[in-house]
Curated annotation (Swiss-Prot):
Gene name of this polypeptide: rbcL
Record-given protein name: Ribulose bisphosphate carboxylase large chain
InterPro entries registered for this protein in UniProt: RuBisCO (IPR033966), RuBisCo_large_chain_AS (IPR020878), RuBisCO_lsu_C (IPR000685), RuBisCO_lsu_C_sf (IPR036376), RuBisCO_lsu_fd_N (IPR017443), RuBisCO_lsu_N_sf (IPR036422), RuBisCO_lsuI (IPR020888)
SUPFAM superfamilies: RuBisCo, C-terminal domain, RuBisCO, large subunit, small (N-terminal) domain
Gene3D superfamilies per the UniProt record, alphabetical: Ribulose bisphosphate carboxylase, large subunit, C-terminal domain, RuBisCO large subunit, N-terminal domain
Family membership: Belongs to the RuBisCO large chain family. Type I subfamily.
Cofactor note text: Binds 1 Mg(2+) ion per subunit.
Residues with N6-carboxylysine modification: K191
Keywords: Calvin cycle, Carbon dioxide fixation, Chloroplast, Disulfide bond, Lyase, Magnesium, Metal-binding, Methylation, Monooxygenase, Oxidoreductase, Photorespiration, Photosynthesis, Plastid
GO CC annotations, alphabetized: chloroplast
BP term (GO), one: photorespiration
Residues reported to bind substrate: N113, T163, K167, R285, H317, S369
NADP as UniProt keyword: no
Length: 459
């Protein structure tokens, strides 16, 4: 009979409930909300087809290849408990559909077209299982957690950071001054805000220079290694690279990139440069909420976090947990572990749909940042553990006596919490007490505690 033209029925080949997934398959879990009257199997096959080899009609060139070898398969569909008309569709993609070492291509394939599909009211990519065979084609983070600790000579505690505010409008000299004060007071890092690139009131080269001066001055005075996340994000990859090169010439330890607005291609290039030249890479997730905030449509942040670990970054912002709902704590810790650990078991209560084996890809430090202050320190230490960066922007700069005392307050609070934990005390229960005790002998901490005391401390 040869070839039969016509619009085709997805039932034919893309829904295969008896398929046994291969170790080399990339697996995806999609949350589907089909249009009224569309059965979930139909929607599931449509997703599998459109994100792999399918098109809407039979084409004669299908006969020139083995579709069976290259097609995505929807191999399982389950209703979502407690939600009306929502299903999780599991899709397996053969490894050969993807270019090696390209997060960009992986996303183009898996989420490129299918989210506009008519048969679906909404679609969300909840998780991806990246097989070791594909993981191994990526460099991953430039250095990873252990190498970073060795470079900085800081062990056994979370690292402290601070975003310099006001984020826009300071001159380079005053900006550098604020950096110096914070580092001098006891922080490990200060940070360019994600919107600080190279604006008329402060060009990037001037900022880099004054920040480098601040770093070296603070290092000389404290005897500790200091850093400032110099934002290398730019309008072109060439310009971004130029900024990273200048940072390396200044001898500073770390640069920064906005990986979603900058794009995965730029980010991966920068990560490769950073490994080749000994720079740490701090990643900010500006724009993530556009993609991950809706519960039923978009991409969950855990997928963006996995993608970043493949593309490359040593730190990434990952929410604070503090003062949020209890459920979010487990979900956040789920993707925090996906960033840090080598091997993570499937655990649906933490939102982890697949067991993920990263083999030896370096880990990423999660960064807790946004609306946190000294009273949160026990909770943060308890939740994130040692391998994290705690960032207090307003929580440092708004200390009543200035930046340096604000930094002192945070460092004292952190050291007190770490010591209490090491002595076996329960940070969840005794957190407030630990901070109060420490503030008795640290006037800076006492002043900070006073400012934020009416803000609730909740686990």
């Amino acid at each position: 009979a040869g070839f039969k033209a016509g619009v085709k029925d997805y039932k034919l080949t893309y829904y295969t409930p008896d398929y046994k997934t291969k170790d080399t398959d990339i697996l995806a879990a999609f949350r589907m909300t089909p249009q009224p009257g569309v059965p979930p199997e139909e929607a599931g096959r449509a997703v599998a087809a459109e994100s792999s080899t399918g098109t809407w009609t039979t084409v004669w060139t299908d006969g020139l290849t083995s579709l069976d070898r290259y097609k995505g398969r929807c191999y399982h569909i389950e209703p979502v408990a407690g939600e009306e008309n929502q299903y999780i569709a599991y899709v397996a993609y053969p490894l050969d559909l993807f270019e090696e070492g390209s997060v960009t291509n992986m996303f183009t394939s898996i989420v490129g077209n299918v989210f506009g599909f008519k048969a679906l009211r909404a679609l969300r990519l909840e998780d991806l299982r990246i097989p070791p065979a594909y993981v191994k084609t990526f460099q991953g983070p430039p250095h990873g957690i252990q190498v970073e600790r060795d470079k900085l000579n800081k062990y056994g505690r979370p690292l402290l950071g601070c975003t310099i505010k006001p984020k826009l409008g300071l001159s380079a000299k005053n900006y550098g001054r604020a950096v110096y004060e914070c580092l001098r007071g006891g922080l490990d890092f200060t940070k360019d805000d994600e919107n600080v690139n190279s604006q008329p009131f402060m060009r990037w080269r001037d900022r880099f220079l004054f920040c480098a001066e601040a770093i070296y001055k603070a290092q000389a005075e404290t005897g500790e290694i200091k850093g400032h996340y110099l934002n290398a994000t730019a309008g072109t990859c060439e310009e971004m690279n130029k900024r990273a090169v200048f940072a390396r010439e200044l001898g500073v330890p770390i640069v920064m990139h906005d990986y979603l607005t900058g794009g995965f291609t730029a980010n991966t290039s920068l990560a490769h440069y950073c490994r080749d030249n000994g720079l740490l890479l701090h990643i900010h997730r500006a724009m993530h909420a556009v993609i991950d905030r809706q519960k039923n449509h978009g991409i969950h942040f855990r997928v963006l976090a996995k993608a970043l670990r493949m593309s490359g970054g040593d730190h990434i912002h990952s929410g604070t947990v503090v003062g949020k709902l209890e459920g979010e704590r487990e979900i956040t810790l789920g993707f925090v572990d996906l960033l840090r650990d080598d091997f993570i078991e499937k655990d649906r209560t933490r939102g982890i749909y697949f067991t993920q084996d990263w083999v030896s890809l370096p880990g990423v430090l999660p960064v807790a940042s946004g609306g946190i202050h000294v009273w949160h320190m026990p909770a943060l230490t308890e939740i994130f553990g040692d391998d994290s960066v705690l960032q207090f922007g307003g929580g440092t700069l708004x200390x009543p006596w200035g930046n340096a005392p604000g930094a002192v307050a945070n460092r004292v609070a952190l050291e007190a919490c770490v010591q209490a934990r090491n002595e076996g005390r329960d940070l969840a229960r005794e957190g407030n007490e630990i901070i109060r005790e420490a503030s008795k002998w640290s006037p800076e901490l006492a002043a900070a505690c006073e400012v934020w005391k009416e803000i609730k401390f909740e686990f």
